């Protein structure tokens, strides 16, 4: 198994490198559109397969995880998760602002070299984006939320005739009306909220909902087994995606030279956040080596770079955290889907740098209040950027908020293919460190819950064993030995653990064996508690 993991890691990293090399080798030959389509076709099919798995993966993982924790533990995990994500997103934005203000990559002379931008302004505001996220948290139709989400749009209405007081001429004024529309994107945030509530209620119901809990546990195991097989397709898909993106870029050399300092600024900011800020935060909380943690995440980071999608990387991130780093699956299955939806550290940093860079291009001096506004709006806007490959729409909102021209943002599209992949890797790393920190902070309460559950199950077993008319254990119960064994398995391999995965029938031990098993279980509980 270890050799297979290492081989898959090597193949994933090699696919990224080979995709870049092939892209630059093929570019000078100016391949036709049909050739480019054929090169990118495996990557296109790969992304469709991965996106097909996102919906069942999120629903089964969130519900099965929260159904196996106490309500108060779920509440604590949720609160700590939100606090962590808000802190890291703000730190990323702050890093970007400090760096771009210090390096000052935006030279007004570049406007003559790059030409005028073509992107249109948007009437959307930061408030619109924030309210859209609140609306999407509570979808009116859960089925519709699987393929659509709400988005505010401003539609032009019939122009009104306005009299000009100075010239007395009639002029036309274009007005816009705010409307709510639906875009064809999965409402991941709404699904997570629904599944979280569903899972918590299942946990409260306990044995009354055991059949439903078992269903989602098994469904989660099926999806992960399926994805484990599909992971061998990741290297081919990543190679195809990276190669096609490099071939598709127009005027790569000229624009890259003009925007070199901008690219360096963004990459430096992302490196500082991922190699200094996040590891330091992880070390301060857990007192463990962050670099050993990052080593276990190499395949997930390479996949994030290749796909430029936090959502597509989600299965690999689950596997890396649960199997390589032994993070409790009840933490990963809630923290990671939420992080892939609302937490975009790399995107927030990138947006802050891009906005101030455009201001520098136009030689616009930003006040302290402008910088504060940028930090707040980029934090809020990055939350709405979703788990799919990021676009530049959210930056337009930030530019409009501080009164900067949004049209010049199109000049950055040429280098966005590279920066998008790097910032996606940073997003995934931030989510992963968050899972590690939250696992550390909640481990004692989760172990306490496991101990209470184990004691309750043992008492039920003893009551059944004391029944003289019972020859074998019924399907709904299990032996003390199987309880102990499953608890030990849970500590060693939380990824494959299921509290319901017990033997259907087990022989009844005699009185001495029963007492010995009970003592063993109590000793196990004490040792597990002392681990914390």
UniProtKB/Swiss-Prot annotation:
Question: Which top-rank group of organisms is this from?
Answer: Eukaryota
Q: Could you tell me which Pfam families the record lists for this protein?
A: SDF
Q: What is its main location?
A: membrane
Q: Which GO terms describe its molecular function?
A: glutamate:sodium symporter activity; L-glutamate transmembrane transporter activity; neutral L-amino acid transmembrane transporter activity
Q: Which InterPro entries match?
A: DAACS, Na-dicarboxylate_symporter, Na-dicarboxylate_symporter_CS, Na:dicarbo_symporter_sf
Glycosylated residues, chain numbering: 164, 169
Provide the protein name. Putative sodium-dependent excitatory amino acid transporter glt-3
């Amino acid at each position: 198994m270890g050799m297979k993991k290492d081989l898959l890691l090597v193949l994933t990293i090699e696919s990224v490198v080979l995709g870049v090399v092939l892209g630059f080798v093929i570019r000078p030959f100016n391949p036709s559109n049909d050739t480019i389509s054929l090169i990118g076709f495996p990557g296109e099919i790969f992304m469709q397969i991965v996106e097909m798995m996102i919906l069942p993966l999120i629903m089964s993982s969130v519900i099965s995880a929260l159904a196996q924790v106490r309500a108060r533990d779920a509440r604590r995990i949720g609160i700590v998760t939100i606090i962590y994500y808000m802190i890291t997103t703000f730190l990323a934005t702050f890093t970007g602002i400090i760096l771009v203000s210090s390096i000052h990559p935006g030279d007004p002379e570049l406007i003559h070299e790059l030409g005028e931008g073509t992107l249109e302004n948007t009437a959307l505001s930061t408030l619109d984006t924030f309210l859209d996220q609140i609306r999407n948290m509570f979808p009116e139709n859960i089925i519709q939320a699987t393929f659509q989400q709400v988005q505010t749009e401003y539609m032009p209405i019939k122009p009104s005739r306005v009299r000009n007081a100075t010239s007395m001429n009639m002029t036309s004024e274009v007005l816009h009306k705010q409307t709510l529309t639906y875009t064809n994107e999965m409402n991941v945030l709404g699904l997570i909220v629904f599944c979280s509530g569903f899972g918590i209620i299942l946990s409260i119901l306990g044995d009354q909902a055991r059949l439903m809990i078992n269903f989602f546990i098994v469904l989660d195991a099926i999806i992960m087994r399926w994805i484990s097989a599909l992971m061998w397709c990741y290297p081919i898909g990543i190679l195809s995606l990276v190669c096609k993106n490099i071939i598709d870029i127009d005027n790569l050399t000229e624009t890259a030279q003009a925007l070199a300092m901008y690219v360096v600024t963004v990459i430096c900011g992302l490196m500082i956040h991922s190699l200094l800020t996040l590891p330091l935060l992880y070390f301060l909380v857990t007192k463990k080596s962050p670099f050993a943690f990052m080593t276990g995440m190499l395949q997930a980071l390479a996949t994030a770079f290749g796909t430029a999608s936090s959502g597509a990387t989600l299965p690999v991130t689950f596997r890396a955290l649960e199997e390589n780093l032994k993070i409790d699956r009840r933490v990963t299955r809630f923290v990671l889907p939420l992080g892939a939806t609302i937490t975009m550290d790399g995107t927030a940093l990138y947006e802050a740098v891009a906005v101030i860079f455009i201001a520098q291009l136009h030689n616009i001096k930003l006040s302290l209040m402008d910088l504060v506004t940028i930090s707040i709006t980029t934090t809020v806007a990055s939350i709405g950027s979703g788990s799919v490959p990021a676009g530049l729409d959210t930056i337009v909102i930030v530019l409009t908020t501080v009164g900067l021209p949004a049209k010049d943002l199109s000049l950055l599209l040429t280098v966005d293919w590279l920066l998008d992949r790097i910032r996606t890797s940073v997003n995934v790393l931030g989510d992963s460190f968050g899972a590690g920190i939250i696992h550390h902070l909640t481990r004692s309460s989760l172990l306490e819950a496991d101990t209470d559950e184990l004691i309750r199950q043992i008492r039920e077993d003893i009551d059944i064993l004391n029944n003289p008319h019972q020859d074998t254990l019924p399907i709904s119960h299990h032996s003390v030995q199987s309880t102990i064994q499953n608890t030990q398995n849970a500590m060693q391999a939380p990824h494959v653990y299921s509290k319901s995965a017990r033997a259907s029938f087990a022989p009844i031990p005699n009185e001495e064996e029963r007492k010995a098993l009970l003592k063993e279980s109590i000793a196990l509980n004490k040792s597990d508690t002392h681990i914390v």
